[in-house]
Swiss-Prot record:
InterPro entries cross-referenced by the UniProt entry: Elafin-like_sf (IPR036645), WAP_dom (IPR008197), WFDC1 (IPR042357)
Signal peptide from the UniProt entry: 1-32
Any one cellular-component term (Gene Ontology): extracellular space
Keywords on record: Disulfide bond, Protease inhibitor, Secreted, Serine protease inhibitor, Signal
Species per Swiss-Prot/TrEMBL record: Gallus gallus
Main location: secreted
Disulfide-linked positions: C68-C98, C80-C102, C85-C97, C91-C106
Protein name: WAP four-disulfide core domain protein 1
Entry's localization field: Secreted
Length: 222
C-alpha cells in the first residue's frame, strides 16, 4: 500500500510539474507575441516617420521663409528632376530652399513685401492750432503712414510738402479709417501748404474726393 501511495504521489507531482511548465510556456508565448507586435508597430511607426518627417520639416521651413516665391499653380517642366535641398545653407547666396511644386529645390529668392505698420507713430511735426500749415524740419520719409479720415480725432496728416496717397479706402460705415503713404508734392512749392488747406476745407473726410483730386493733379502735373 505504501509503495502504491508513493507512486501515486510521484505521478501527481509529475502532472503538476507538466501543467506548470505548460502554463509557463503559454505565458512566455503571450509575452513573446506581445513583444513581437510591439516591435512590428514600432518598426512601422519609424518607417512612417521617416517618410513624413521631411515633409513636415520642409513645410514648417517654407512657412517661415518669406524669401521664397509663391508655389506655382501648375507643375513646371522637370520640376521633380532638379536636385533637392533641405535648408538654405545648401543653396547659393542669392537662392533659397523653396517648394517648386514637386520638391524642395534651390530657387531664386524674392524680396519680402514692404511692411506698413499702421500703429507706428508718425515722425514729430510742428504742433499748434494750425500745425499742419507750418513748415517742419526737412527729412526723408520712408513709407510714412497717413489718413484723411476724420472720426472725432485729428486725421493723420502728412508733414508739410507731402500729400497722402490713399492705398486702402477703408470703410467709414464700420469705423475703419482709410490709410495711405506720404508722397512728396510736385509743382510750385509756394502753393503746397494751401493744398493741405484746400483738402481740409473743401473735401473734409470724403476720401473718394481726395483720391479723385490727387489723380487730377497728377494728370495735370504729368
Amino acid at each position: 500500500m505504501d509503495s502504491r501511495m508513493l507512486s501515486d504521489q510521484r505521478f501527481c507531482r509529475r502532472i503538476f510539474a507538466a501543467a506548470l511548465c505548460v502554463l509557463v510556456l503559454l505565458a512566455d508565448s503571450g509575452c513573446a507575441r506581445n513583444l513581437w507586435k510591439r516591435a512590428l508597430h514600432l518598426k512601422m511607426t519609424e518607417k512612417y516617420d521617416d517618410y513624413e518627417y521631411p515633409l513636415h520639416s520642409h513645410s514648417a521651413h517654407y512657412q517661415k521663409n518669406d524669401r521664397c516665391p509663391p508655389p506655382p499653380q501648375t507643375l513646371p517642366d522637370r520640376a521633380c528632376e532638379v536636385p533637392s535641398c533641405r535648408s538654405d545653407s545648401e543653396c547659393e547666396r542669392h537662392k533659397r530652399c523653396c517648394y517648386n511644386g514637386c520638391i524642395y529645390a534651390c530657387l531664386e529668392s524674392v524680396q519680402p513685401p514692404p511692411v506698413l505698420d499702421w500703429l507706428v507713430q508718425p515722425k514729430p511735426r510742428w504742433l499748434g492750432g494750425n500745425g499742419w500749415l507750418l513748415d517742419g524740419p526737412e527729412e526723408v520719409l520712408q513709407a510714412e503712414a497717413c489718413s484723411t479720415t476724420e472720426d472725432g480725432d485729428e486725421p493723420l496728416h502728412c508733414p508739410t510738402g507731402y500729400e497722402c496717397h490713399i492705398i486702402n479706402p477703408g470703410n467709414t460705415a464700420e469705423g475703419i479709417p482709410n490709410r495711405g503713404q506720404c508722397i512728396k508734392l510736385r509743382g510750385n512749392p509756394d502753393g503746397r501748404n494751401l493744398r493741405h488747406k484746400y483738402y481740409k476745407e473743401y473735401f473734409g473726410s470724403n476720401s473718394n474726393n481726395v483720391v479723385g483730386y490727387v489723380k487730377n493733379q497728377q494728370k495735370h502735373l504729368g
